[in-house]
Design a protein with these regions (language model features):
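Short aromatic-glycine-enriched beta-strand elements
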Residues: 42-48
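Small side chains
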Residues: 3, 14-15, 30, 34, ...
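Mixed-charge, Lys/Arg-rich low-complexity intrinsically disordered regions
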Residues: 1-23
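A short, structured loop/turn motif at beta-sheet edges
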Residues: 5-7, 39-42
Length: 76
């Protein structure tokens, strides 16, 4: 699936690795659930407004997710 297959307003779940730490040299894993609020089809990315109560270890309230690097499901 690519960014063209996902619509703004859809609810998705995604698991992905992200960089963290003082210099960005550490890696952690997050599982998020939320609504797609923007998308960049040319970079195969979507911006997700994260539901923090339904998510685990989210790096922020809004997260850009690279669809080719994440395990994701469309919940709608």
């Amino acid at each position: 699936m690519t960014g063209k297959d996902i619509q703004i307003g859809q609810n998705i779940s995604a698991g992905f690795f992200f960089r963290c730490g003082h210099y960005g040299d550490d890696v952690d894993y997050a599982i998020i659930t939320g609504v797609v609020i923007r998308k960049l089809e040319c970079y195969n990315q979507v911006l997700v407004d994260v539901d923090l109560e339904q998510s685990f270890n989210s790096p922020g309230k809004s997260v850009w997710v690279r669809l080719d690097k994440a395990d994701f499901n469309i919940n709608n």
